[in-house]
Amino acid sequence: MDFPRGLLVAWTLSLWPGFTDTFNMDTRNPRVIAGPSAAFFGYTVQQHDISGKKWLVVGAPMETNGHQKTGDVYKCPVTQGNCTKLNLGRVTLSNVSERKDNMRLGLSLATNPKDNSFLACSPLWSHECGSSYYTTGMCSRANSNFRFSKTVAPALQRCQTYMDIVIVLDGSNSIYPWVEVQHFLINILKKFYIGPGQIQVGIVQYGEDAVHEFHLNDYRSVKDVVEAASHIEQRGGTETRTAFGIEFARSEAFQKGGRKGAKKVMIVITDGESHDSPDLEKVIRQSEKDNVTRYAVAVLGYYNRRGINPETFLNEIKYIASDPDDKHFFNVTDEAALKDIVDALGDRIFSLEGTNKNETSFGLEMSQTGFSSHVVEDGILLGAVGAYDWNGAVLKETSAGKVIPHRESYLKEFPEELKNHAAYLGYTVTSVVSSRQGRVYVAGAPRFNHTGKVILFSMHNNRSLTIHQALRGEQIGSYFGSEITSVDVNDDRVTDVLLVGAPMYFSEGRERGKVYVYNLRQNRFVYNGTLKDSHSYQNARFGSCIASVQDLNQDSYNDVVVGAPLEDSHRGAIYIFHGFQTNILKKPMQRITASELAPGLQHFGCSIHGQLDLNEDGLVDLAVGALGNAVVLWARPVVQINASLHFEPSKINIFHKDCKRNGRDATCLAAFLCFIPIFLAPHFQTATVGIRYNATMDERRYMPRAHLDEGGDQFTNRAVLLSSGQEHCQRINFHVLDTADYVKPVAFSVEYSLEDPDNGPMLDNGWPTTLRVSVPFWNGCNEDEHCVPDLVLDARSDLPTAMEYCQRVLGRPAQDCSSYTLSFDTTVFIIESTRRRVAVEATLENRGENAYSAVLNISQSENLQFASLIQKDDSDNSIECVNEERRLHKKVCNVSYPFFRAKAKVAFRLDFEFSKSVFLHHLQIHLGAGSDSHEQDSTADDNTALLRFHLKYEADVLFTRSSSLSHFEVKANSSLESYDGIGPPFNCVFKVQNLGFFPIHGVMMKITVPIATRGGNRLLMLRDFFTDQGNTSCNIWGNSTEYRSTPTEEDLSHAPQRNHSNSDVVSIICNLRLAPSQETSFYLVGNLWLTSLKALKYRSLKITVNAALQRQFHSPFIFREEDPSRQVTFEISKQEDWQVPIWIIVGSTLGGLLLLALLVLALWKLGFFKSAKRKREPGLGPIPKELK
């Protein structure tokens, strides 16, 4: 249906099913049908339909019939009443000597849905053959009315003792004594295996005439035959008509009671030549034609007693015996000696027993046919695990006959060298259908190579097989292939999944079991993982039974149920796996344990069947076998509740107050809550279901913004009855008062559930039971309700440029600063030594419409740490930053949440501290403004501000020097011996200490030491140089040793200052790296060269060692003074006798006297030598005496 504009429908959860321990199989009301536990009632179970009435067919393979444990099958009504034994264990197979004790009838059951018949098998049914019992197995078919209709025994073959033996006995007068002949008869008859399907014996006595002592079918046991033979009297006669007796036996004895196909054996016993020997040739020819094997016994008593040569007699008897004579001819000395040939005669008659070279003679004797069974279109597949020396086989019984594949047909997958492994092929049988190959049979061999194997094959009427594919197990002893099930998930008559059980798979120290999943892909089954059992590690034998069942959860896909009969301490459990599309979901939808159904259940899950609706409610039900019980689990209908919610009006306009609530103006709205139930099963399209629901407003807020008119912010436990397919709606009135947050929508939550979850319909697994819909606030923007902001961000820092630093800090004029900045990039900014922070002044302005959820994103380079944000104005707008420890160099700040108003502006200051651990040659600060409202691209360029500066750092260092020698006086009597033959020693130290915040690098220390004059005279010798920092690398340049040892005359009085500008020097250059507060010292150790200092001409001499700090070309550090330097000066003075010439002394004296005379003359001319007399002023008194 179409809803009006503004309808909000909840997003439902995915329909893909999830996990649950309780779904739609009812565990509260099971039907538990009890039977005899000792009979293993429940070992197999099948659902059965007879004219609409539902039954369970339950196998009890250890059931007793009379004194024998034959096993049997019960029919059980599914609703009420007791089970009835069908007495199929009393069924007898004629014409065989059968043994029915422990034949395990009901060990396998197979139903035929076409005619509602079923097959119950007795794989251990056996019959007697000679000295052996052959366990060939047998199955009994019952019709739809549970009545026996047919015996199926394809492995049953005629015994090698299937013989009709006629003894032709000479009873003429010459036979004596007769009692010895009777003893011979009794002894030889006791060696015969007489019984149905084995040996029949008839006796003909002849002389002059021939009579039947008894016919072949007169007696069916050794006891009866021996009893009858013991009463045979000698009939006598004067003639011995052996030819007549043989013909009589051939033509009459083999016809009266003889069996078709039975081997004909004739034993002729006589004591003399025949009176009708001319007829022997014809008689023997007729016997050969009838395939009568003849054993002839010549009794020589008559000849020996009379001393007659028996040669002619013996030749006649040999002629009567079949060829070769050595195997068919016997002679004894007399009648008493007949007892001596009993064993030999018996052995020769049965010489072929057990050694027949027919290819199947040893193949099917122990086949145990019916160990597994499976109904197909044209017959029945039967597993024969004991066939071919227990390698196993699969036989097929059809209306046209039976198909028994040759042993060689299996050799491709079951090679001869592994025949002693007892593969047990046929342990389970099933079939699959592919679009290309049609029906393909599947059989498991769980003991093949100890790991198990499954083969997929086609069977042909010429007894050959075509094996299409083989699947192999992975673990020794896991019994892979002991259970196999094919699944047509989507019901398109093509198999989608093949499941293979390995119930003894060992995992986590337990026999947990495993079920392998194979999907059909291009007519081959491809491994696709395993089904999941419970996570409780126990001996469960998960996969002992796997059943493909009809759609249980009514989603149109067939499902699978897996039994774990040993789980939960042998109480047992079953797992229900749902089908989906062409797959079986790996995780169980429901796990049902025996303990939750009824007390005392054991081995629950040993058999499973689910194909019929047993209680006429339109749903498929489950039948599960347990030890001594059969359990019926009823399916519950599945319903889907579709919930929807819409509001009138569709948005909350807090600027429009249209009602009063609790005396306050409010905005009133209505919510319409609607439910539509959908039953998945067609049978329930007119059903009803009751639900209960709760409604809550703004459930996740401590103070809800919306309230229900009925009071509060929620109401609970409302009940409503819904009809299938019909919509039911309810109006819920609510209101909104003033709120500060009108950006986030108001959430309206509804939780609903079935009114009676334990009975009636079941809510579909995975179907949502919660509906959350939000009603938004009107945003106050233009008519299309789409806000378009225009954010403008501006930012600048307080860092000085190189020019500003030069003028303000260094105090230089602009002209000098122009040349100062030439060594830097014009974009370089200077970090003064006292600076620890960087400040950014910024403004954010919204020149457009409201910006909802506006944010300011702040990020900085790693050498900065965010310190603070200070708002600079008193506007209503605010900025609040969120601390995120995981994002150290990023910060997100909310601007005037929930929205930044149109035409609003906010100014703020950002402070960043320099990092103590990260040092970079640049810094970067990025500011970006954004919001949930969409800004036009044409105005988005000014939403960001990027401050990126290349930096130079002002180094703050303390640079000092000290020296052990500052002045030395060279005296004439100065001796070198007191100075180790060199001169006075000195020790200079230059110390540099980093007083700043940043680590210093890219700086060199250059020390120049004057070593000698330009004339080659040594001034001092540098003996050693070292530093106190191991990470300081230094290079020394210049020659400090190769100067002349004898000084030459050189006058230094005109240039007494000796330094790097006028002397040969040694230069020491070191790379300097200093962490904050770290210091390093440079040490120079040497001696003044006294020999030269005494020889050179000077009065006073100063030798200066200079140390200067120099920045490298790309160094990030600068100094306030250009290349700061420190000097150490050695001041040297010299005492010496000066010889002045006489003419200089005389000239100087006369010159001095002349100069004195001229000075006196000048003073005289000026009146310097006259007395000064003052005139007294009038009025003055006399001059004081003291003044005079």
Swiss-Prot record:
Q: Where does Ca(2+) 3 bind?
A: D613, N615, D617, D621
Q: What is known of its domains?
A: The integrin I-domain (insert) is a VWFA domain. Integrins with I-domains do not undergo protease cleavage.
Question: What is the species of this protein?
Answer: Mus musculus
Extract the PROSITE patterns matched here.
Answer: FG_GAP, VWFA
InterPro entries of this UniProt entry?
FG-GAP (IPR013517), Int_alpha_beta-p (IPR013519), Integrin_alpha (IPR000413), Integrin_alpha_Ig-like_1 (IPR013649), Integrin_alpha_Ig-like_2 (IPR048285), Integrin_alpha_N (IPR028994), Integrin_dom_sf (IPR032695), VWF_A (IPR002035)
Entry's Gene Ontology cellular component terms: integrin complex
Task: Indicate the principal place this protein occupies in or around the cell.
Answer: membrane
**What start and end residues bound the annotated signal peptide?**
1-22
What is the protein's name according to its record?
Integrin alpha-11
User: Any idea where the VWFA domain is?
Assistant: 164-345
Instruction: List localization entries.
Output: Membrane
Gene Ontology annotations of biological process type: cell adhesion; fibroblast migration; integrin-mediated signaling pathway; substrate-dependent cell migration
